[in-house]
């Protein structure tokens, strides 16, 4: 009897996914445990292994298919002696997804076309211009949507009409561009961050940290290792450990919002934002407060490599109670990050730069790092956030406290 290959559920919350690539073709022999396809989830690309032996008789869902429902039939394995007629009859009886996918895709494209038309009409109805500018435009037969306004908030004023000529009109439709389809990861990022910004009452607190002592200790530790970069401790490793220690001291910052209650977590699991080719992923350091700097650094390097290779497993990126996003390596001084819901906090880390500061009534040069905490005001108040940042600053400026 033919054997079903179903779209797997690679996480508890997964409802559908993209079938990114088939690694086997029709007619190939398949053994148990052999990787046959790659599935793109909301966070990573996962390998799918066959649990049975047979011949890949028919691929139902082609590669690069999007939004394939979990547990839908994606392919069929055949056993020895089964005919093409047997396979076709089996598919006809068991497959109801292929047609629905095509229908959904057609409807989606139609809806997108309608939406695009509506957006254009909506935009044209909201052209702001002064009454005099409108009269002049009508007299001169000038379309207001072709005029770039120079007034407040882009308002078209008299001078814009007087100085307008068709040669100055700017139309982006004539530009050359390349169109990159939004993959599943990018769509999920867009959806989650939009929901976070629209539904979570963000507030922001910033603090400056002197990292001179931290840099000295890091240099001393790294000198004891070989020249292999894989063994070196990074500044970000210290930041993760400092956050873990601060959350241990201020447990009320290690929380998330639920409709029925605020959840305070016993474990200190820290998500760390990692840039990948298709967007961003947040692998998790579990029980970060219980690990020393060497263990934490080693684990983080493994997670970063797996993230960039799209090899993270769901348990390695789902969950977490607090997120760190570090853009300091790009020279960014400070920034306000968007909360990674349902978490209640994300800390944006900026670059460390030499600055003049006052210490003991003397002006000295110190290496200062800016950090900005974005917090969910439903969960955490300003006092708790300030207490957390003060604790974090203490660990960063006195790094020996993290190592004992």
UniProtKB/Swiss-Prot annotation:
Instruction: Quote the record's cofactor note.
Output: Binds 1 lipoyl cofactor covalently.
Domain Lipoyl-binding as annotated: residue spans:
2-78
**Single GO MF descriptor:** dihydrolipoyllysine-residue acetyltransferase activity
Keyword annotations: Acyltransferase, Lipoyl, Transferase
A GO cellular-component term linked to this record:
pyruvate dehydrogenase complex
User: Which coenzyme or cofactor does it need?
Assistant: (R)-lipoate
Q: Which residues form the active site?
A: 377
Peripheral subunit-binding (PSBD) domain span: 128-165
Short name of one Pfam family: E3_binding
On whether Metal-binding is a keyword of this UniProt record, the answer is no
Q: What is its EC number?
A: 2.3.1.12
How does this chain assemble?
Answer: Forms a 24-polypeptide structural core with octahedral symmetry.
Name of the protein described by the UniProt record? Dihydrolipoyllysine-residue acetyltransferase component of pyruvate dehydrogenase complex
What species is given as this protein's source?
Rickettsia typhi (strain ATCC VR-144 / Wilmington)
